[in-house]
Amino acid sequence: MTKHKLTTNAGAPVPDNQNAMTAGPRGPMLLQDVWFLEKLAHFDREVIPERRMHAKGSGAYGTFTVTHDITSYTKAALFSKIGKKTDLFVRFSTVAGERGAADAERDIRGFAIKFYTEQGNWDLVGNNTPVFFLRDPLKFPDLNHAVKRDPRTNMRSAKNNWDFWTSLPEALHQVTVVMSDRGIPASYRHMHGFGSHTFSFISPDNQRYWVKFHLRTQQGIKNLTDAEAEAIVARDRESHQRDLYDSIERGDFPRWTMYVQVMPEKDAEKLPYHPFDLTKVWFHKDCPLIEVGVLELNRNPENYFAEVEQAAFNPANVVPGISFSPDKMLQGRLFSYGDAHRYRLGVNHHLIPVNAARCPVHSYHRDGAMRVDGNHGSTLAYEPNSYGEWQEQPDFAEPPLAIRGDAAHWNFREDDADYYDQPGRLFRLMTPQQQDELFQNTARAMGDAPEEIKRRHVGNCAKADPAYGAGVARALGLKM
């Protein structure tokens, strides 16, 4: 028998949790039944706004262990020596679906990592694909609206989805990945992760390197066909979450090997493709993979809402030695993610335990809704001042970044219009069976989209490789 007795939020004993207070056994309820009022008022507010994207997620705690030396590229403390361990929290997710969506749907998967370092939290907010649909964040709300529910029917719309994707030819690379055999991972454990964006390393001698992060699963890649996924969804909508949770509970801890691709700052100008374009990858022949360490997940959360639903990842959270790049999608996310968290969780979401830094924090910010720490007590609230409080730290300033050009709404399609080379290369890397799966998956996904949209997609595919376009056309039953 538990010794935990029921109380109100104020700590008073609850004498009856079975019957509301009424005037007589059949009379009306009384307003003075404060336990009923408290219980129902809390119930009415239990649901917080869901994430606009990545709403359905699963999480786990673990560690990152350095296995190889990269200190010549970065002064970040978590990479400072071989054998160093850093605690972390990971949230996996589907992207387009709501909180109640099935895990085994054809979709990108989110792969967000919060490293609790001694220099602050570093959030690597990535996906299971190395590229994305867009390279300009101004179109991100449009992507969201295209893949979410139609405002009239409240149903997902292949017409809306494919009309948008095919109208942006730069999306073809990501579309090819999502429609391939890797579009439905068998589980979160059996997929790779990518930082996707170009970030930067700052070295001990204050030199800048451009960097991309890769996480390769040690469990091996496993995927589902459409038919296999449909059978799983019919019996278990939480298949990915169940697989992750159960594997950790039985001690079968999933692991990923971290690699980086590194490029000296000046070399970015020499590449034949745009190094800060999120719709493109860096070729391994140009920037080979460099092994860094191992990520292991070994502890499940105790409370899903507190630790997974309230987790807030923000690519703006970096530490000394890791920074940003001119990648426009990354720069757009630097604002959008924090802003979304302030709406969803409140301005003090950084105080929620799963989000809280584990190093000393001496932030300038105070007050605001749900401030639950000491709010800096009587410490003065302005800077500069005469008392040495809130001192800035110029030793951690980054080297200057050279930029050039006039301010304007530049059409990047005039700067780099090659959207087809890399999707074509990816297509030609596939086996004939994988290519056929790509054709058939695309045809099923396009569903009842109008023929003009289907023909537009076939045209985009043909520019990547004539065989790609011809195969999709055959699967769609189109005569070209």
Swiss-Prot record:
Family of this protein: Belongs to the catalase family.
Catalytic activity, EC: 1.11.1.6
Any GO CC annotation of this UniProt entry: cytoplasm
Key words of the record: Heme, Hydrogen peroxide, Iron, Metal-binding, Oxidoreductase, Peroxidase
GO BP terms: hydrogen peroxide catabolic process; response to hydrogen peroxide
InterPro entries from the UniProt entry: Catalase, Catalase_3, Catalase_AS, Catalase_clade1/3, Catalase_core, Catalase_haem_BS, Catalase_immune_responsive, Catalase_sf
Active site (catalytic residues): H54, N127
Cofactor: heme
Reaction it catalyzes: 2 H2O2 = O2 + 2 H2O
GO MF terms, alphabetically ordered: catalase activity; heme binding; metal ion binding
Coiled coil start-end: none
The protein's name: Catalase
Highest taxon, organism lineage: Bacteria
Region Disordered, annotated ranges: 1-23
SMART domains assigned: Catalase
Lineage, opening ranks: Bacteria, Pseudomonadati, Thermodesulfobacteriota, Desulfovibrionia, Desulfovibrionales
TM region positions: none
Listed Pfam families: Catalase, Catalase-rel
Keyword Ubl conjugation: no
Role, per record: Decomposes hydrogen peroxide into water and oxygen; serves to protect cells from the toxic effects of hydrogen peroxide.
Record: residues binding heme: Y337
Statement: the UniProt record of this protein carries the keyword Electron transport: no
